[in-house]
C-alpha cells in the first residue's frame, strides 16, 4: 500500500506538470509556471495543490520510515504556507505588493522543501549508499538550480527539475524494500 500512496501522487503531479507546461516554452522566461498561471489561474492552482500534496505525502512517509525526528512537520507547514502564498498572490509586476508576496511564497516553498528533502537524506547519510548518493544529487541540483536561476531568471525547466528530482528520489526510497541496497 505504501508504494501506491507514494507513487500515485508523484505520477499524477508529474503528468499534470508536463501537461501544464505545454502552455509555455519551458526554457524561456514566459514558460515559467507562475507566468503561465497569469493566463490560466485555475490550472496553476491545480498544479500547486498537486505538487505540494505529492511532496508532503512523500516527505512524511520518508521521515516516518527512516528517522525518528518530527522536525519535518514545521518545515512542511512553512513550505505549504509558501505554496499558498504563491497560489494566492499574482505574479504581476504591475501589482507590486502581490508580486513580491508571490515571489516570497515561491522562494519559501522552493527553499524549505529542498532543505527538508536534503536534511532527510543527510540524516540517513551513513545508513546506506543510496542516501549518500541522494544527498549529493540533491545538493548538486539545489545549488545548480540556484545558479541557473540567478543567470537565466525563472523558466519552467529551472522550476521543475528540483521538483521532479524530489518526486523520483522520494518515491524510490519510499517504495524500496527494507532489505534491498540499490547502489550496493
Which residues are covered by each model-predicted region?
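Interfacial helix-start motif at the membrane-water boundary
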Residues: 35-55
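Membrane-interfacial loop-to-transmembrane alpha-helix junctions, especially the N-terminal start
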Residues: 2-10, 67-79, 127-138
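Membrane-proximal helix-loop-helix units in multi-pass membrane proteins
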Residues: 79-130
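Terminal transmembrane helical module of multi-pass membrane proteins
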Residues: 122-184
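Membrane-interface interhelical loops and short amphipathic "cap" helices
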Residues: 26-39, 95-97
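Alpha-helical transmembrane segments of multi-pass membrane proteins
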Residues: 10-27
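Juxtamembrane "helix-exit" motif on the non-cytosolic side of transmembrane helices
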Residues: 21-25, 63, 88-96, 122-123, ...
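Non-cytosolic membrane-interface motifs at loop->transmembrane helix junctions
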Residues: 34, 95-108, 155-164
Amino acid at each position: 500500500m505504501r508504494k501506491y500512496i507514494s507513487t500515485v501522487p508523484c505520477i499524477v503531479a508529474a503528468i499534470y506538470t508536463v501537461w501544464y507546461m505545454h502552455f509555455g516554452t519551458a526554457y524561456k522566461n514566459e514558460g515559467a509556471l507562475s507566468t503561465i498561471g497569469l493566463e490560466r489561474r485555475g490550472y496553476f492552482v491545480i498544479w500547486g495543490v498537486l505538487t505540494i500534496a505529492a511532496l508532503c505525502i512523500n516527505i512524511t512517509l520518508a521521515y516516518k520510515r527512516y528517522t525518528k525526528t518530527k522536525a519535518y512537520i514545521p518545515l512542511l507547514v512553512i513550505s505549504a504556507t509558501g505554496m499558498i502564498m504563491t497560489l494566492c498572490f499574482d505574479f504581476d509586476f504591475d501589482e507590486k505588493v502581490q508580486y513580491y508576496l508571490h515571489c516570497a511564497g515561491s522562494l519559501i516553498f522552493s527553499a524549505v522543501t529542498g532543505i527538508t528533502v536534503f536534511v532527510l537524506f543527510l540524516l540517513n547519510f551513513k545508513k546506506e549508499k543510496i542516501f549518500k548518493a541522494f544527498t549529493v544529487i540533491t545538493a548538486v541540483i539545489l545549488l545548480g538550480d540556484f545558479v541557473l536561476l540567478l543567470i537565466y531568471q525563472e523558466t519552467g525547466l529551472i522550476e521543475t527539475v528540483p521538483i521532479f528530482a524530489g518526486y523520483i528520489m522520494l518515491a524510490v526510497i519510499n517504495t524500496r524494500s527494507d532489505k534491498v541496497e540499490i547502489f550496493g
